Amino acid sequence: MSNSVEERTRIKNERYESGVIPYAKMGYWDPEYAVKDTDILALFRVSPQPGVDPIEASAAVAGESSTATWTVVWTDLLTACDLYRAKAYKVDAVPNTSDQYFAYIAYDIDLFEEGSIANLTASIIGNVFGFKAIKALRLEDMRIPVAYLKTIQGPATGIIVERERMDKFGRPFLGPTVKPKLGLSGKNYGRVVYEGLRGGLDFLKDDENINSQPFMRWKERFLYSMEAVNRSIAATGEVKGHYMNVTASTMEDMYERAEFAKQLGTVIIMIDLVIGYTAIQSMGIWARKNDMILHLHRAGNSTYSRQKIHGMNFRVICKWMRMAGVDHIHAGTVVGKLEGDPLMIRGFYNTLLLSELAIDLPKGIFFEQDWAALRKVTPVASGGIHCGQMHQLLDYLGNDVVLQFGGGTIGHPDGIQAGATANRVALESMVIARNEERDYVAEGPQILLDAAKTCGPLQTALDLWKDITFNYTSTDTADFVETPTANV
């Protein structure tokens, strides 16, 4: 080999191109790529900066979420770089927009540690959302291959086993959040739990921010709550539960609280989304080993899931949480006070409940998904709902859901037990009408009025809340069809 600089440079350039070159040219754009069954697929909504080609922007997302950095590095030659590069293989304009694009990206399964939501997310959403060439970026959907799902535990209990444990079949579960969420003493807290369960509810729950504050420490809350559960079971003959929030500052504290809850005899514990993916997976594994139902409150999700052009769609969180091992997750109400377009909510529920998903663009489902026998997650509908909406809730959300009437139980003028009874009677009257094949949606208001003739608490609730609703336009709506975004 010649020792001249020119000759060494020529040979190097034939083998390896250095410097800053476009991501698309580096191999992160491949429109001919044949997607493998084992690939992890992601769909991003990409909003490039003015002047940035959408294909180059999509290739940049693929590169920065897999193996690339800002310049070519020679150590690529020490890896199977052609295999490990993520490939943007399809870029489509988003309907009815001028500067948004759907980028389909494939990742080889070997890029990810088996069974680790933390590692999966570190690549997919780890760094790329701050990329300057893109003014906004949103992760809309993912396909997780069966080969990867087989390394994941999935829900600790699942809805089928939960129904068997709770002895509740043929209708939604009922349960509100204790209100006010903060400030009650342990004894008063337990009284709220007892009254709600005694009145006919299946569950009560802690709220997301009740942990162990000076006005009520966690152990005090657990003791009074379980006393209430046991007394209500004795009084009604029904299986009851209370979601005990074990969220804490360390895993050691969470395990301690969960173990104490188990010793008290609870059938369900609760955690918050804000504890993080590793902590959620860890608690899912604990719950499976200890035959415990695991409820997840989605606290904090709207900071990144609500806006349409940046962040992450809630359906992706649903997929990750089904993998992580939770049994419940709040997933929207349609008619309540929180964000919820009807088609988007249906897509979330399908993601949590179906064994296989087909592509359904109006509901925001971009990929087929085989869940590989992972158990089903029960969606939770909570926030601004009341018994006067029971026909709508049953129609939109179906049987497999927890309907949580917090203010709609505890705000009843005649007390908590009356509020619980109103909700139970409203639900059972609507389920009976449905099972009789009546048009319970159209007849819903009259069905409730008829039931109220023999249930004073229901009549009082209907008189109080009437047809109150939170009629605001949703921010996260379908891209492929027009959809009613306000409550209907």
Swiss-Prot record:
Compartment list: Plastid, Chloroplast
Keywords, sorted A to Z: Calvin cycle, Carbon dioxide fixation, Chloroplast, Lyase, Magnesium, Metal-binding, Monooxygenase, Oxidoreductase, Photorespiration, Photosynthesis, Plastid
Positions where N6-carboxylysine occurs in the chain: K205
GO biological process: reductive pentose-phosphate cycle
Reaction it catalyzes: 2 (2R)-3-phosphoglycerate + 2 H(+) = D-ribulose 1,5-bisphosphate + CO2 + H2O; D-ribulose 1,5-bisphosphate + O2 = 2-phosphoglycolate + (2R)-3-phosphoglycerate + 2 H(+)
Amino-acid positions noted as binding Mg(2+) in the UniProt annotation, renumbered to this chain: K205, D207, E208
Gene Ontology MF term list: magnesium ion binding; monooxygenase activity; ribulose-bisphosphate carboxylase activity
Cofactor: binding details: Binds 1 Mg(2+) ion per subunit.
Binding residues annotated for substrate, in chain numbering: N127, T177, K181, R298, H330, S382
Chain's role: RuBisCO catalyzes two reactions: the carboxylation of D-ribulose 1,5-bisphosphate, the primary event in carbon dioxide fixation, as well as the oxidative fragmentation of the pentose substrate in the photorespiration process. Both reactions occur simultaneously and in competition at the same active site.
Family that this chain belongs to: Belongs to the RuBisCO large chain family. Type I subfamily.
Additional observations: The basic functional RuBisCO is composed of a large chain homodimer in a 'head-to-tail' conformation. In form I RuBisCO this homodimer is arranged in a barrel-like tetramer with the small subunits forming a tetrameric 'cap' on each end of the 'barrel'.
Protein name per Swiss-Prot or TrEMBL: Ribulose bisphosphate carboxylase large chain
